[in-house]
Curated annotation (Swiss-Prot):
Acidic residues bias locations: 39-56
GO molecular function per UniProt: calcium channel activity; cAMP binding; cGMP binding; intracellularly cAMP-activated cation channel activity; intracellularly cGMP-activated cation channel activity; protein-containing complex binding; sodium channel activity
Record membrane topology: Multi-pass membrane protein
Record protein name field: Cyclic nucleotide-gated channel alpha-1
PROSITE patterns to which the protein is assigned, alphabetical: CNMP_BINDING_1, CNMP_BINDING_2, CNMP_BINDING_3
Gene field: CNGA1
Binding positions for 3',5'-cyclic GMP per the UniProt entry: 544, 547, 560-561
Organism: Canis lupus familiaris
Length: 691
């Protein structure tokens, strides 16, 4: 179509000059339409180039048309006018045909653009949906992971917690019930038959507790590298691999089914329930560590063991008497047909009495008659000697441990009494010393804290000291804003001290080497006469903090400025100057801050000479630094001398070892060389003969 338009254009240019100006306008309009059509068609390069050539020719053609149209006559115009009109109609019709195509293209382009927009929207919506689905999947996966973790990490009982300890108490009750009542019911028939309903209830309640105990064991954590294991599989595996699982399993075997075959008069079929005794021992052990009266608990525990052994021995004695026959001889239990000995209570009490006399060997019992009776009595005597000797020895050691602290304290008092008597100390002084010791004992202050805490690691010792003393140390003004590390260092250096009534903690003019914090008691700031009181210091007060800082410019120097006296018995914490300076060596900023605070306090009290304080460094400080450097140099020299001596000794030892090795290897080397020389001499004549 484009080529047709161009051909018509060329033909139109060659038409004689009969075309009117209106036709020229139409031609221009057609030209513009052709250009737009050519610009829309990207693939037809040839048509575009042809159109460009025609475009270059059009100005000349248009000018020629105008000139010719002006020259030609109207008759000529009329002659050529029908052809031009026909040509114009052809071109116009082609242009009209082209216009709907262009509109269609534009519509298609609009549709394609709108379609692209819709597709982009759909793609973005799809992406959003996919992202939402991924988020949902991630949430579901996280929820599954959490559920799996919850399944794996089930509720675990801490073996060091109160819940586990309370459960041990619950399981101890059925264990003690079985250990006392099963043997008694098996030996005393009336006890089993008269109270059968109660025994059935108690038996199966204890069985339920036993089963629950096995479940609790599978939920009881254990420490692995200091961390509590909470995984269910590991807990179950740990329990199953233990010997206690086998004993627990044997203890819950339903042996009660034998009741249907043997009858209800055989409670001894439940003897497997006694295998759970380890839980009772564990409960006693944990109670001993928890109680504040361990010695009393140990004694009561031993008494309980004695009673259980006597109880078992009494039951065995009664069963042996039943097997031999009641009343057949003087050793066995009397005839039960006698109303006096037919009651259940009398049977048990008589057997218990006989067992106690036999095992403790403190009374006379009827002599045995039969061989079986002799054997039983001999076994009882051996058990009594071995067990009760051990028990009595333990009780004796417990009692001695209970009195060990008192005996040690009394030994100190006796030693001081002997010393005062030897030195002829006055009676008043002796009374004061004895009263002071009585105060320490009654208030339980005889314990040496360092001796008690020396077995703990440094971390635990520091935590205990922080819990006990940190709040007290923070009350001191100069330590209020100090670093936590410095406070911990100072807390570990606090020393407890006790003063009796009338004791002077410090006097005016004394050199201040310590500062004091009042823990308990009252102190008075008194005049020189020791009677007039200016101020009374109570719990939480402190004094002497300025003197240990040795602040330059202090008018008092490091001297005490007041007399402080104890009114009653007073407990103080003491911090020495050396300990403070040792701690401040690692905290130079804190040292500067403490000195500034001390200067401010002295300025408020008017005890600071500003000129001296603002002066340069004190020569004394320089001397102290020089002495410290000299000491460090001396220390390095001694270390160097020691290392040099060790080096020389090692060198001497190496020389000695080398000489020994040379002496040992020299004959061997000589023999080897001689052998080599001999072989060389033999080979020479052989070579000559061959030549």
């Amino acid at each position: 179509m484009k080529k047709n338009i161009i051909n018509t254009w060329y033909s139109f240019v060659n038409i004689p000059n009969v075309i009117v100006p209106d036709i020229e306008k139409e031609i221009r309009r057609m030209e513009n339409g052709a250009r737009s059509s050519f610009s829309d068609d990207d693939g037809d390069d040839d048509s575009a180039s042809m159109f460009e050539e025609s475009e270059n020719e059009t100005p000349h053609a248009r000018d020629s048309c105008r000139n010719n149209s002006q020259r030609r006559d109207p008759s000529q115009r009329e002659q050529y006018l029908p052809g031009a009109i026909a040509l114009f109609n052809v071109n116009n019709s082609s242009n009209k045909e082209q216009e709907p195509k262009e509109k269609k293209k534009k519509k298609k382009e609009k549709k394609s653009k709108s379609g692209d927009k819709n597709e982009n929207k759909k793609d973005s919506e799809k992406k959003k949906k996919k992202e939402k689905e991924k988020e949902k999947k991630n949430k579901e996966e996280k929820g599954k992971d959490k559920k799996e973790e919850e399944k794996k990490e089930v509720m675990v009982i801490d073996p060091a917690g109160n819940m586990y300890y309370n459960w041990l108490f619950c399981i101890t009750l059925p264990v003690m019930y079985n250990w006392t009542m099963v043997i008694a019911r098996a030996c005393f028939d009336e006890l089993q038959s008269d109270y059968l309903e109660y025994w059935i209830i108690f038996d199966y309640l204890s069985d339920i507790v036993y089963l629950l105990d096995m479940f609790v064991r599978t939920r009881t954590g254990y420490l692995e590298q200091g961390l509590l294991v909470r995984e269910e599989a590991k807990l179950i595996e740990k329990y199953k691999s233990n010997l206690q699982f086998k004993l627990d399993f044997l203890s819950v075997i339903p042996t009660d089914l034998l009741y249907f075959k043997l009858g209800w008069n055989y409670p001894e079929i439940r003897l497997n329930r006694l295998l759970r005794i380890s839980r009772m021992f564990e409960f006693f052990q944990r109670t001993e560590t928890r109680t504040n009266y361990p010695n009393i608990f140990r004694i009561s525990n031993l008494v309980m063991y004695i009673v259980i052994i006597i109880h078992w021995n009494a039951c065995v004695y009664f069963s042996i008497s039943k097997a031999i026959g009641f009343g057949n001889d003087t050793w066995v239990y009397p005839d039960v047909n006698d109303p006096e000995f037919g009651r259940l209570a009398r049977k048990y009490v008589y057997s218990l009495y006989w067992s106690t006399l036999t095992l403790t060997t403190i009374g006379e019992t009827p002599p045995p008659v039969r061989d079986s009776e002799y054997v039983f009595v001999v076994v009882d005597f051996l058990i009594g000697v071995l067990i009760f000797a051990t028990i009595v020895g333990n009780i004796g050691s417990m009692i001695s441990n209970m009195n060990a602290a008192r005996a040690e304290f009394q030994a100190r008092i006796d030693a001081i009494k002997q010393y005062m008597h030897f030195r002829n100390v006055s009676k008043d002084m002796e009374k004061r010393v004895i009263k002071w010791f009585d105060y320490l004992w009654t208030n339980k202050k005889t314990v040496d804290e360092k001796e008690v805490l020396k077995y703990l690691p440094d971390k635990l010792r520091a935590e205990i000291a922080i819990n006990v003393h940190l709040d007290t140390l923070k009350k001191v003004r100069i330590f209020a804003d100090c670093e936590a590390g410095l406070l911990v260092e100072l807390v570990l250096k606090l020393q407890p001290q006790v003063y009796s009534p009338g004791d002077y903690i410090c006097k005016k003019g004394d050199i201040g080497r310590e500062m004091y914090i009042i823990k308990e008691g009252k102190l008075a700031v008194v005049a020189d006469d020791g009677i007039t009181q200016f101020v009374v210091l109570s719990d939480g007060s402190y004094f002497g903090e300025i003197s240990i800082l040795n602040i330059k410019g202090s008018k008092a120097g490091n001297r005490r400025t007041a007399n402080i006296k104890s009114i009653g018995y007073s407990d103080l914490f003491c911090l020495s100057k050396d300990d403070l300076m040792e701690a401040l060596t690692e905290y130079p900023d804190a040292k500067t801050m403490l000195e500034e605070k001390g200067k401010q306090i002295l300025m408020k009290d008017g005890l600071l000479d500003i000129n001296i304080a603002n002066a340069g460094s004190d020569p004394k400080d320089l001397e102290e630094k020089v002495t410290r450097m000299e000491g460090s140099v001396d220390l390095l020299q001694t270390r160097f001398a020691r290392i040099l001596a060790e080096y020389e000794s090692m060198q001497q030892k190496l020389k000695q070892r080398l000489t020994k090795v040379e002496r040992f290897l020299k004959p061997i080397i000589d023999t080897e060389f001689s052998a080599l020389e001999g072989t060389g001499d033999e080979s020479r004549p052989l070579d000559s003969t061959q030549d």
